[in-house]
């Protein structure tokens, strides 16, 4: 028997408890052979001298974790899982609100039950899509229990924000607009102290099994729990598809608990020429049409921490500072404006919009906003035919680039698609 590599696939699921592996809920299409998970146990050498001229007398299994990287054309319906992982502050607004009611009592971060002032089993059924609150703290949940005596439950979507008594509640439909910002609240995902975003299980479906002990695998897949993204790179080249790449750390892999289901995205990648770039002024003004390529890089510091706990896996993979940088290649400049961004240190807004131009369930749109971008490089280049500038910028954290958790942030992504929750 053989296992063709093109029949392998990558699955993702948001974990309800950090480090507890789940079967994938969605498949993330990727470039062939780009998914590179690797278990990285440390081996502790015994090199104590004992009367011989050998160097090593044993390797003792030490602490364990894993790394991963993958990428390819950007699929704007599934990559929200990874944006949520690296940013942590996620608010969502649905469309066509109906069956309006309100909360009968305040809700805390991490809650999975709400009491409503109105509603019925018909208007709030099991599996229904419900929006709680509005503005920066709006969130969408999928009901795991129909309205019963005024109570709804959503065990798969613990609340990310606190909600006041009387906050609005409605049923909603697609499309959904998701806003990703840096999490700054004291309570992180699931109501755990420490401003930590959610973790995910990445599943590598290899179609390879193993019969033996320990580690028998009959699922044909390996799960990488507690996956934390350390870097996300988005690249737009005017002659290519929009591409994205992710990398990070996770716990050591283990056999998936069952054969996973391949839930493939039906969306298509987007050509980069469909993007619009704005520099300075407001988000809707100052369009710049001389940029041939741009890149946005989001980096999150991670620290893998092991403790004396009788387990070789990490105690936690901690998330720290988040930074956003980027490049803008002005391949057709008409003057020295790209140079002036650096020399004058104007630190303008950088705003990118990518819209596939479709409608209904096929409509996909992503925007990125950095309200204060410090241009640190503007190198003149001599292209094949024309003069050009290769610019680099660094984000400056401001109150304009935040979500419902407040504070200061370096930038914000929004996604519009038909995916209700991440």
What are these regions (language model features)?
Residues 1-422:
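Signature of extracytoplasmic/envelope-associated structural regions
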